[in-house]
Regions:
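Positively charged n-region of N-terminal signal peptides that target proteins for export
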Residues: 1-4
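Hydrophobic structural segments
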Residues: 6, 12, 17-296
């Protein structure tokens, strides 16, 4: 009888005070599906969610319960294995899972690598979602926010629209070396005079194509461009010719991953602001390239 009275009293409190009901739910732990997490993401980006987008599920069942979330730059096979070992069954990746922008798999029908990756995702009940277009489109751009934070260059940012920084004066070689150390990069490549003193730097992340890179380099207030990757026969040759003409220009290529991965580290922190009671962790993909000079 006493237990029944207590239950009725508690029910009455919840009816009178909806906030108490919310608190009780939070205290007992919220179960969410991957689809529900994505709906929260859609509600928290500042841009309108587009119907034509690569930001879709790439594997697994969106209606499965999320035990934990792993954010990553690339859902590599090793990243998937690490996520599984940590109990993080929902992987949010920035780049494709199946080696092409749209994650099309028809052309890989008999490919053993793709088949094994698909099988691993299925057998381990993992869910993979790509978060690319809207992470770039939200304001501020999530990848850029993470990169500026990792670089520690917020105080040097002079033009946020064109990502131009006024840095303490240093040589191109010293700047390239500092970037290599900052990102533990194994394959930084440079075009230009290593001894040239520079202060005005621009940042163009990822692989946007040559024209955004060249348009940045043609500015009078840009001496050195820090970029992810490029077509060597376009931006690289543009800078080589500019240097041959006596223009104060240089290009530092740090690799696509190194130019964007910090943004997915930041994504994990961003998600924690509105996804509660679910473990969220960033897993690095790691630089896939290596330099024979570094092999001992």
């Amino acid at each position: 009888m006493k237990k029944g009275i207590i239950s009725l009293l508690l029910f009455g409190i919840l009816l009178v005070n909806p906030q108490s009901r919310n608190n009780l739910s939070a205290n007992t732990g919220n179960k969410m599906t991957a689809a529900e997490v994505v709906n929260l993401i859609k509600n928290n980006v500042t841009c309108q969610w587009q119907s034509k987008t690569v930001d879709t599920f790439k594997g697994g069942n969106p209606d499965d319960e999320v035990k934990g979330i792993a954010t990553t730059f690339m859902a590599t096979f090793n990243v998937l294995k690490k996520a599984k070992s940590k109990g993080l069954n929902f992987i949010i990746t920035h780049e494709p899972t199946y080696y092409n922008h749209f994650d099309e798999t028809a052309q890989f029908e008999d490919d053993k690598v793709v088949a094994e990756k698909m099988r691993f995702i299925k057998e381990n009940h993992l869910i993979v979602f790509r978060f690319h277009d809207h992470w770039h489109t939200t304001n501020p751009d999530g990848i850029i926010s993470g990169m500026i934070s990792r670089l520690g260059w917020g105080k040097y940012l002079q033009d946020k629209n064109n990502l131009i920084f006024v840095l303490p004066e240093m040589t191109v070689k010293d700047l390239a070396t500092s970037l290599q150390e900052k990102f533990n990069a194994t394959a930084v490549r440079v075009v230009g005079d290593p001894g040239m003193e520079v202060t005005n730097a621009a940042l163009v992340v990822g692989a946007p194509g040559s024209m955004p890179q060249i348009k940045s380099l043609e500015r009078d207030d840009v001496e050195v461009l820090i970029a992810g990757e490029t077509h060597e026969w376009e931006t690289v040759e543009y800078v080589r010719d500019a240097v041959s003409m006596g223009k104060k220009k240089a290009l530092i290529l740090i690799g696509h991953l190194n130019s964007e991965e910090a943004g997915m580290d930041y994504c994990a922190k961003w998600l924690k602001g509105f996804v509660k009671d679910i473990p969220i962790e960033f897993i690095t993909s790691g630089d896939p390239l290596w330099n024979p000079q570094l092999i001992k």
